[in-house]
A protein has these predicted regions:
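Short S/T/G/P-rich N-terminal loop/turn motif that feeds into the first structured element of a domain
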Residues: 1-53, 60-66, 70, 93-95
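C-terminal structural segments of small proteins and small subunits
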Residues: 62-90
């Protein structure tokens, strides 16, 4: 089966302000069948300007990744991080 992923890049402006989001996000992931593959908060960026945060989350399919993003639970979590970060999130599928 083709896996789905969230690829997240960007910057965190107030690290302590992100703690509630990170705690709830980490607890929420298993409830949607997802797992955190990579969390690098100080990435060594060699090209481009994606920011120092790089996160990859794996889902059982791209459809599940999209459904998780669109879920009420995740939409509520987003509000916990908005004022503390500038992040981009893209849903992708594996080959």
């Amino acid at each position: 089966m083709t896996k789905g992923y969230w690829v997240v890049t960007g910057n965190i402006h107030t690290p302590l302000g992100m703690v509630p989001y990170i705690n709830k996000f980490t607890a929420w992931l298993p409830t949607v069948g997802a797992r955190l593959l990579i969390r690098d908060l100080q990435a060594d960026v060699r090209e481009g300007t994606p920011g120092s945060v790089n996160i990859i989350v794996e889902f059982n399919s791209k459809e599940k990744a999209v459904a998780a993003y669109e879920s009420t639970e995740y939409q509520e979590l987003i509000n916990l991080r908005l004022q503390h970060s500038s992040l981009s999130l893209t849903s992708k599928k594996s080959y």
